[in-house]
Amino acid sequence: ANSAVCYCLGVTEVDPQRGGLLFERFISSERREPPDIDVDFEHERREEVIQYIYGKYGRERAGIAATVISYRGRSAIREVGKAFGLSEDTIGALSSSIWGGGAGSVSKDAVTRTGLDPQSRRMRQILTLAQEINGFPRHLSQHVGGFVMTRSRLDEVMPIGNAAMDDRTFVEWDKDDLDALGILKIDVLGLGMLSCLRKALDLVDEHYGERYTLATIPPEDPAVYHMLCRADSLGVFQVESRAQMTMLPRLAPRSFYDLVIEVAIVRPGPIQGDMVHPYLRRRRGQEPISYPSKKLEAVLSKTLGVPLFQEQAMKIAIVAAGFTPSEADRLRRAMATFKRVGTIGTFQRKMIDGMLANGYEREFAERCFQQIEGFGEYGFPESHAASFALLVYASAWLKCRYPDAFAAALLNAQPMGFYAPAQIVRDAREHGVEVRPPDINHSCWDSTLEPGPRAAERLHELHREMRDDIHTMHAVRLGLREIKGLSEEDSKLIVERRMRSSSSDESKISIAYDSMRDVWLRTGFSLRVLERLADADAFGSLGCLTRREALWAAKALGRVGDRDDDLPLFTSRGGAPARIVSQEPEVRLPPMPIGEEVINDYRFLHLSLRAHPAQFLRPDLDARGIKQNDALRRTPSGMRARISGLVTCRQRPGSANGVVFMTIEDETAVANVIVWPKVFERLRPIVLSARYVAVIGVVQEESGVIHVVADQLEDLTHFLARLAEHGADIDGLARSDEVRRPIEEQREARIAGGRHNRLVQLMREMPELAGDLGVSARGSAHAPARRARIN
């Protein structure tokens, strides 16, 4: 984004002149190397670009760069544990106690919980060796996006290997080796938000007749900034994390450059360099804005005298410390990049001495270097922040004006971002968008838009002020991609066989399926595929066919047509399976309890449009004195509160000094929980693995953002096993929410993350009891259909 040439060519939509970006960050006469270009493509089409490069330049002149994968906390303990003969279960338990993919270590408490003695000679040796090999090279892998292109043949200069993926080759040198040789490397990166934006803009064009691009989206829309100031940013690029949501109301962006700062300020560099609070105080008028010299005012005026970007650190070094552009570029190289700690400390003496020689006071020079030293913990270039800010604004504008198209596009671009489909669906419904379930007659592979009610009339009370901002007049129909285990090929066949050629012209018209048998005959699906569709309750349009009735109808078809098992007696003269079977007698099946419906929704769709699991548990929660999450809005700051919810997100940023941020939700609202390091170490198993938690802590409110600072956590995951016991006494129109896996999918008898459902076990042992209760022995609707075949 620093290059006017790249802007004119359309490589970037960010105008470097408008942003005043530093061209030397892109290329300079002192840098005897080609410019560093990172190009982001739609993540779904990145492979097309890679194959295009191979096709244009040939594999002998183009290849993906390599990268060295090093041992980190989990891989180190796994490798050492394996060498010492620990069992897989023990290794898994030890490694799972380490947060994420960082260079953490196993605590003594974690060792004790696995049943081992942390003081034993063997265990001490394992922990010591695992710590020592942290950061050691482990193996060579493909670089995330670095592409090498040369004029002469690559295989005459460096070794080339075949990648595991078909049609890929990579050079067996990493990017530092390539830089040393002066070989051109361009980063060809995939970005999920670009796929999302393209799909959303296509939906807006198709259903609203408005054609926009990144360059033509209306700029500086006040409604967009007002939405972001309320931290209403779920799904919005770069500002949807818990840390960014906390920062948005405090920074209160009102212009595009404010978004550039928002992207850059929540990074380890500014945080470690103590730049965040001074900037916010100056922005609010709580601290005077001052500059030690006119030269530095020109460098720092856009950020109120506080250095927030790498380019500013380079300019300060040149202007205040007398660095040459070449030395400033070496300073840039010493700054950290993602997952690589910088070595900026080696410039301390030169920079401070240079500033003293230019008349600056030592106190200011040391404070200035301390701030710049923060970039040794990963700071953001202004050019990157500007590029990302453009996507922040575009995605926020779509969310504000067309939440239906934005939600559908987010679902169709998965996996990406912080949030799973259930949270995206919940947020869309809160913004007034009607969301409809996947259906055999209405759904395609992707989620689509259908005529629906005006979203402005259905807004949740939290978003009522957006009434005049939202243009949405469509409902989102969930795509067949949401059904677990259904392939894209099968879903395309469903749509294809639904279409018939029109007799009047060459166009095609949709002929709805009218029965399970019709679906079977037209598609030729096996029983297994029909069961997947029935499990997902995708036959609702077939005469209000319920999940249980659909499974019965699928089982009633028997295995005729399941080609591998057809017997000669049931084949036609041509050898093809006969498609005519006797009609199954009609039966009246008892309705499935809504609790069981919700369980199956989560099992086969990973979300539910019927109800939130917390609704079923409310009597038990009330008995424990646990309040609904929306009560936090009425709780004064500083008061203690007791809440609960499904854990939807856990974050432990490297810049947060061990603090864990959890997001939990119940049937009423989402709550933000802060877990301090001492509490985390004491309750580590709950924080890391609980699906449903109760939280006791102190309410904190700042700039409209509410947190609960936890001092006690209780694992209530076993409560989820009670869902199947609840009948139709719950409002079936409740909002949808997410629980990652309320039931372990591979072990159907184990409910909610490993807690054994004794009711299910009892029903397996006594099928007659299951019949009396009106539920199946597997906690699903399969049992009645199996009995039909036996009878």
Regions found by a protein language model. Name each.
Residues 1-791:
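Noncatalytic, beta-rich nucleic-acid-contacting surfaces in large DNA/RNA-processing enzymes
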